[in-house]
């Protein structure tokens, strides 16, 4: 049991010694992306090899003092596209291996764990340059990690490793050197703004909750993260769960709350498992529960698993769901800080916001403000996806430009394709163009151009992307996820989706563009909650920045990107066709005819424009008009 400050300091001292005593640590990425590509089997294989290796003492239990080799499951190591990822650490020397397979494990163990060789074929390679360690990889080296600083470096489930890395130092400092009001003052002075999308200053929320007369206060964490392609919060919850919990404990200490709730979306089973494990361990050692560290401060944590509704990311809908009611937004005021969970004053922040708090308390508000911009201090995590060379999880200072993220960190577009747009902020965000590449990525700057930082999804699109279809896709998502409580969102998004579907089907009219703009602005102004207010942004931003594509779809009945099925027509070039019959044999509706070894043709009246012929032609004889 860790019952007082002295006991915590002793555990930290011992944990640091154990961590430093390893001859080698095999760090297997167990982020969701790597688990999907087989990292669990790789972890098991390394355990099997190490167990049978002569003269090797492997760690089987936590805090094993006799072990000199540790096989660890870490959080996300970042370069998700190149998984499964494995790091071999000997002291300060770290080798980063990529795309590791089961058959590579024995070789890695013999050459890099027991020996000092590096296996070059498994290293990160780009443009003829080979990168040996994580710090040599531009994707990682050009980041500034605060929230993600432990991810990929330590065992995500080990309390000892978290404490050894500086964990709970901030809580210890707050409880023994600062009163609750001073903690709030530091958070407020740091200028940290909510990382869930709204960008409201976190300290202002805490200031409003703390002095309220009601003796019951709550802290709640929004771990919903429903944006398609976003996985930042999930990576923190599964890769560094103790950091999130420490951040919530600091909030609870500051606003005098005794209970905290983490709402986790249903699609994050590994996050739920890691958080449950962390809470159980902390309760067992006395760092959660009653009279923590003998200070009289008591705090209990609970996990609520969502049912997958996107709207539950909205504060009042989230608290309603935790209470057992249907997750739908309510009219405000009163706001969550006044009447939140069970109508009690509630601090509600997202995962990334809480994960920043320990560093702010430990290093001070001035240190935090030295990073980022004046109006948006600190760093921001982003999930970088789409038509880009390096996809994965990144963390950069606020104010970093899109150009730096896409071309310096992301490595540019795949196959040398031309950049067209970047969709930022998920279904609630907007699409920015090449002329916006040098815009600082912070809460205020991107807003001027019809986008939002949001939770941090970045989808890079190349010249083969149809922006009208992008707008239709996101409007379809938000329309399906609308709770239906208010008319502007329930009916308005449906009408906008119908117009967009009409345009991509080749039946649009020029007056439809005015209708989309009118509806979009009406929904943005009149909807009840943030989901409805931001739902039209992808449409409005593409109308502003890519209006010519809408006109092309309507007037010319043409999709230059060849994405909209209704506007495609497939043609066989008789000069290239060899009459192999493969296209005819695979056509699901028999629209292709021709004799063997003679040029074939497509009956456009029968063609359903599925593209099967294009996929099957090995001679490049079929093209799309």
Q: Residue ranges of each PLM-predicted region?
A:
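Hydrophobic alpha-helical positions that pack around
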Residues: 142-143, 272-398, 410
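Gly-rich Lys/Arg/Thr-decorated short loops/hinges at beta-loop-alpha junctions or inter-strand turns
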Residues: 153-169, 221-233, 336-341, 383-388, ...
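C-terminal accessory/binding modules appended to enzymatic or scaffolding proteins
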Residues: 376-390, 396-398, 402, 563-608, ...
């Amino acid at each position: 049991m860790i019952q007082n400050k002295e006991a915590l300091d002793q555990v930290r001292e011992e944990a640091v010694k154990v961590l430093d005593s390893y001859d080698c640590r095999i760090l297997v990425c167990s982020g969701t992306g790597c688990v999907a590509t087989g990292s669990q089997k790789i972890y098991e294989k390394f355990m099997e090899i190490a167990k049978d290796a002569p003269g090797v003492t492997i760690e089987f239990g936590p805090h094993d003092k006799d072990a000199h080799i540790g096989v660890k499951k870490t959080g996300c190591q970042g370069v998700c596209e190149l998984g499964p990822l494995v790091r071999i650490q000997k002291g300060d020397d770290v080798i980063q291996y990529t795309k590791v397979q089961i058959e590579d494990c024995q070789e890695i163990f013999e050459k890099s764990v027991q020996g000092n060789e590096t296996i070059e074929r498994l290293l990160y390679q780009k443009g003829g340059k080979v990168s040996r360690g994580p710090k040599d990889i531009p994707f990682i080296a050009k980041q500034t990690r605060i929230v993600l600083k432990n991810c990929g470096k330590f065992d995500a489930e080990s309390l000892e490793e978290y404490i050894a890395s500086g964990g709970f130092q901030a809580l210890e400092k707050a409880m023994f050197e600062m009163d609750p009001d001073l903690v709030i003052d530091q958070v407020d002075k740091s200028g940290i703004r909510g990382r869930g999308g709204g960008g409201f200053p976190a300290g202002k929320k805490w200031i409003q909750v703390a002095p309220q007369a009601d003796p019951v206060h709550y802290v709640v964490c929004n771990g919903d993260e429903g944006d398609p392609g976003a996985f930042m919060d999930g990576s923190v919850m599964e890769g560094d769960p103790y950091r999130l919990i420490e951040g919530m404990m600091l909030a609870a200490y500051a606003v005098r709350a005794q209970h905290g709730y983490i709402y986790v979306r249903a699609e994050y089973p590994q996050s739920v498992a890691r958080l449950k494990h962390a809470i159980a361990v902390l309760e067992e050692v006395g760092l959660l529960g009653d009279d923590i560290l003998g200070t009289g401060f008591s705090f209990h944590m609970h996990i609520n698993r969502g049912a997958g509704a996107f709207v539950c990311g909205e504060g009042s809908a989230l608290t309603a769901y935790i209470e057992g009611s249907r997750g739908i937004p309510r009219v405000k005021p009163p706001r969550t800080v006044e009447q939140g969970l069970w109508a009690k004053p509630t601090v509600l922040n997202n995962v990334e916001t809480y994960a920043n708090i320990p560093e702010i308390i430990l290093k001070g508000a001035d240190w935090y403000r030295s990073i980022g911009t004046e109006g948006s201090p600190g760093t921001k995590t982003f999930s970088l996806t789409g038509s880009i060379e390096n996809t994965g999880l990144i963390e950069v200072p606020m104010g970093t430009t899109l150009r730096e993220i896409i071309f310096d960190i992301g490595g540019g577009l795949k196959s040398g394709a031309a950049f067209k747009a970047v969709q930022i902020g998920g279904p609630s965000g907007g699409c920015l163009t090449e002329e916006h590449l040098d815009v600082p990525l912070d809460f205020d700057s991107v807003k001027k151009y019809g986008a939002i930082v949001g939770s941090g999804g970045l989808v890079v699109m190349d010249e083969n992307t149809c922006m009208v279809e992008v707008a239709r896709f996101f409007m379809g998502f938000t329309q399906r996820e609308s709770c239906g409580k208010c008319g502007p969102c329930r009916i308005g998004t449906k009408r906008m989706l119908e117009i967009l579907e009409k345009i991509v089907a080749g039946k649009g009219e020029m007056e439809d563009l005015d209708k989309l703009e009118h509806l979009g602005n009406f929904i943005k102004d009149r909807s009840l909650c943030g989901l409805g207010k931001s739902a039209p942004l992808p449409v409005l931003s593409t109308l502003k920045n890519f209006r010519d594509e809408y006109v092309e779809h309507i007037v010319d009945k043409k999709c230059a990107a060849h994405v909209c099925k209704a506007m495609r027509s497939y043609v066989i070039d008789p000069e290239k066709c060899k009459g192999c019959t493969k296209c005819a044999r695979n056509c699901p509706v028999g629209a292709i005819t021709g004799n063997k070894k003679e040029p074939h043709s497509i009956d456009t009246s029968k063609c359903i424009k599925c593209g099967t012929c294009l996929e099957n032609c090995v001679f490049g004889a079929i093209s799309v008009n």
